[in-house]
């Protein structure tokens, strides 16, 4: 469990940072060790670093209560949701002067007008990672390859080697791109059609994944996966046969991950000091060099070692980025509806059944078993009396 910390800035304090896995430079390969550098710069503040693998995992733990977290780094739509639900503290930007370095493009976003609750940490795109040893590049023309199909609807030979997101928002976004729907639709009929498309995909999917994608793709246990561009660059460093495709014609998710302070924080000033440190251009540049994501701070790029591939994948042209869509927070009832549909798809529960029908079936079985057991018990008692 995440522990608490003292609220006294002039005393030794510990801040609990809750972030994605493999999402901060740890000093490997000659890169900066961000946390070690921070603790050296601020000897009275120690960092307890804990990771999550999806926004939904993070939200569930935060909403459950009973923990203390000082800094979290959720994605754009989750920032909006947490703010709407009163789970974030307004930031005191007097303690975050380095926020001035954030590019204009990332200021005043729709998910957090005026950046009241967040400071951008990184940004990126979602595309298709594939292994050129096993996958014909001519087959990779759009999201349909994740259904083991080409653009003409013909079956391919990659069934069982395809991975899919294990979170509802990213999985539904891909289906929405295929069907031509908005990634932010709240129309239940459109969402049901997306779920049915994902249900059709299930037989060709090897696994639903998040962080497992690294080992599976690097070790060639899987050949095709949708994932984040920055993580592709990390994986391609381990397996040079991996390639990346961004389906611009169909659309893709353009996301921002941002630093926030939740209401369960016990030392806001120390938390803001940490956020400010991460916004220093030199620190941000060194950090992004290791995690391979795009920085929202252009001044940081002069401290980065960007090769041609990193530049083209992490910093597409503005015209191309305009084809991407950012997630917006959805109403709570829509989120529940989508989560329920996705749970049924990934667990192989037919969408033709009424929601909850599988529970009723099991309840009927339990009642029947109990009735049989009760009858047997009564019969046994009668025999004993005889």
Where do the PLM segments sit?
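A ligand-binding cleft/hinge motif common to bilobed small-molecule-binding domains
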Residues: 78-81, 224-241
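Periplasmic-binding protein-like
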Residues: 101, 124, 191-200, 239-263
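Mature extracytoplasmic/periplasmic domains
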Residues: 262-326
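Early extracytoplasmic/lumenal segment of secretory-pathway proteins
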Residues: 10-81
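Extracytoplasmic ligand-binding site segments that recognize negatively charged/polar headgroups
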Residues: 18-31, 68, 73-204, 209-218
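Conserved C-terminal helix/tail region of periplasmic/extracytoplasmic solute-binding proteins
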Residues: 215, 319-386
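Paired acidic/hydrophobic, glycine-rich loop segments that form the ligand-binding mouth/hinge
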Residues: 70-73, 206-207, 223-228, 243-244
């Amino acid at each position: 469990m995440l522990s608490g910390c003292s609220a006294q800035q002039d005393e030794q304090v510990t801040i609990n940072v809750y972030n994605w896995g493999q999402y901060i430079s740890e000093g490997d390969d000659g890169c900066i060790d961000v946390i070690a550098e921070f603790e050296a710069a601020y000897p009275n503040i120690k960092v307890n670093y804990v990771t999550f693998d999806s926004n939904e995992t993070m939200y569930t733990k935060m909403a459950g209560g009973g923990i203390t977290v000082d800094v979290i780094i959720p994605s754009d739509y989750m920032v909006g949701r947490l703010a709407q639900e009163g789970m974030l503290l307004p930031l005191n930007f007097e303690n975050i002067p380095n926020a001035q370095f954030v590019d204009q493009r990332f200021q005043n976003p729709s998910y957090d007008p005026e950046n009241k609750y967040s400071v951008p940490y990184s940004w990126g795109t979602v595309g298709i990672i594939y292994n050129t040893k096993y996958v014909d590049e001519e087959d990779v023309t759009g999201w349909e390859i994740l259904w083991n199909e080409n653009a003409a609807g013909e079956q391919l030979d990659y069934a069982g080697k395809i991975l899919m997101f294990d979170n509802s928002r990213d999985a539904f976004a891909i289906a929405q791109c295929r069907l031509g729907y908005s990634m932010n639709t709240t129309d239940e009929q459109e969402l049901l059609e997306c779920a049915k498309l994902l249900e059709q995909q299930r037989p060709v999917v090897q696994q639903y994944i998040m962080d497992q994608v690294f080992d599976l793709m690097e070790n060639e246990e899987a050949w095709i996966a949708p994932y984040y561009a920055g993580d592709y660059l990390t994986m391609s460093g381990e397996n040079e046969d991996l390639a990346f495709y961004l389906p611009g014609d169909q659309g893709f998710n353009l996301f921002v991950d941002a630093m926030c302070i939740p209401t369960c924080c016990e030392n806001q000033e120390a938390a803001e000091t940490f956020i400010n440190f991460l916004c220093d251009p030199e620190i941000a540049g060194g950090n992004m060099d290791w995690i391979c994501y795009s920085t929202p701070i252009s001044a940081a790029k002069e401290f980065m070692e960007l090769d041609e591939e990193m530049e083209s994948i992490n910093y597409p042209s503005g015209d191309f980025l305009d084809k991407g869509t950012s997630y917006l927070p959805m109403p709570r009832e829509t989120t529940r509806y989508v989560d329920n549909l996705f749970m049924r798809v990934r667990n192989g529960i037919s969408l033709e059944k009424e929601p909850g029908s599988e529970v009723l079936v099991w309840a009927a079985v339990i009642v029947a078993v109990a009735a049989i057991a009760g009858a047997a018990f009564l019969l046994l008692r009668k025999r004993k009396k005889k």
